[in-house]
């Protein structure tokens, strides 16, 4: 069960202007706006599978095409105004008919930051291009009355590791932190926590994923550029703001952060907003998670559980 649930529950990458091109061109114009244009084309996303040799070839051919050149100029103008870069996010949704497809698309297209939505009914997969956080998309899908599981996030490019996740499993603090590689120089970070004390908490990436003594054994702040004076430590993630219910949400981006270098390290949350040298309040190990086109399994190979038979208790008990 562990193999499917980890990749389903914990998958989450951010597109800088230069790397938005392959997604923008490859993404099918299947939203309501494209249906009014008889000349629009719909692309099959089967090439996004990592096992397909077409993946890298298509990305390269799109970038070098005249169409890509035209879109590059247009997207560079608009990308500077966006708070967050775009990502391709995949959900598996329990859909059985075209009515389900329309309900899902119509709901998602009302969310701010979503540019395109494509639904693959045969595989029960919904692909979303946009800058909206996973939390907003998940809530929208739940409001349609259909079961949905996040199965992948990133960009259709040949990164060594495109996505990673850290799960906080209690007993008091629960949460999920998702990292997604947008370009070689940019990563997107999204986090949800419950069970924190109200107020401001500092948080960071520490060197080691050793939880033998909890956060105290995770080492010091991750800072591969420590020889460069005047630069902020790469592992410093700033602060989290927990509301009166102890819930905190974060969505941001980090330059020079490479997701592949984070695997095996730890995310640590601290009690206050100015103490990253203390033992820490809680910690979780950063593990690889599924990127785009990497996780279409509906059946767990370890115990035969179907994805829709999994209960909420099988997943991290946090509002993510």
UniProtKB/Swiss-Prot annotation:
Tissue: Expressed in roots, shoots, stems and flowers, and at lower levels in rosette and cauline leaves.
Annotated positions binding Cu cation 1: 97, 100
Targeting presequence: 1-67
Presence of the UniProt keyword Transit peptide in the record: yes
Swiss-Prot/TrEMBL cofactor(s): Cu(2+)
PROSITE patterns documented for this protein: HMA_2
GO MF terms, alphabetically ordered: copper ion binding; superoxide dismutase copper chaperone activity
Localisation: Plastid, Chloroplast; Cytoplasm, Cytosol
Record-level GO BP terms: intracellular copper ion homeostasis; superoxide metabolic process
Location, primary (coarse class): plastid
HMA domain sequence ranges: 86-149
Gene Ontology cellular component list: chloroplast; chloroplast stroma; cytosol
Family, as annotated: In the C-terminal section; belongs to the Cu-Zn superoxide dismutase family.
The protein's name in its UniProt record: Copper chaperone for superoxide dismutase, chloroplastic/cytosolic
Originating species: Arabidopsis thaliana
Gene: CCS
């Amino acid at each position: 069960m562990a193999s499917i649930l980890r990749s389903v529950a914990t998958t989450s990458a951010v597109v800088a202007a230069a790397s938005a091109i392959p997604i923008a061109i490859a993404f099918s114009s299947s939203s309501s706006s494209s249906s009014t244009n008889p000349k629009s084309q719909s692309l099959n996303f089967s090439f996004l599978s990592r096992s397909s040799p077409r993946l890298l070839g298509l990305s390269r051919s799109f970038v070098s095409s005249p169409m890509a050149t035209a879109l590059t100029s247009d997207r560079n103008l608009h990308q500077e105004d966006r708070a967050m870069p775009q990502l391709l996010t995949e959900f598996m949704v329990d859909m059985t008919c075209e009515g389900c497809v329309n309900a899902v698309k119509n709901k998602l297209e009302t969310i701010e930051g979503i540019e395109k939505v494509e639904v693959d009914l045969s595989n029960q997969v919904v692909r979303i291009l946009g800058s909206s956080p996973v939390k907003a998309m998940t809530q929208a899908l739940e409001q349609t009355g259909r079961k949905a599981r996040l199965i992948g996030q990133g960009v259709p490019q040949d990164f060594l590791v495109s996505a990673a996740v850290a799960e906080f499993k209690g007993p008091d603090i629960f949460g999920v932190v998702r990292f997604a590689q947008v370009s070689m120089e940019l990563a997107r970070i999204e986090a949800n926590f419950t069970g924190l004390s109200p107020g401001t908490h500092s948080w960071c990436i520490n060197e080691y994923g050793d939880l033998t003594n909890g956060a105290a054994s995770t080492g010091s702040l991750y800072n591969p550029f420590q020889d460069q004076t005047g630069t902020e430590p790469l592992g410093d993630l700033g602060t989290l703001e927990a509301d009166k219910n102890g819930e905190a949400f974060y969505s941001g981006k980090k330059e020079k952060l490479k997701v592949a270098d984070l695997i095996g390290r730890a995310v640590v949350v601290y009690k206050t907003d100015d103490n990253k040298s203390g033992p820490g309040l809680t910690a979780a190990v950063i593990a690889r998670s599924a990127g785009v086109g990497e996780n279409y399994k509906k059946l767990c190979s370890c115990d035969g559980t179907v994805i829709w038979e999994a209960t909420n208790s099988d997943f991290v008990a946090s509002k993510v």
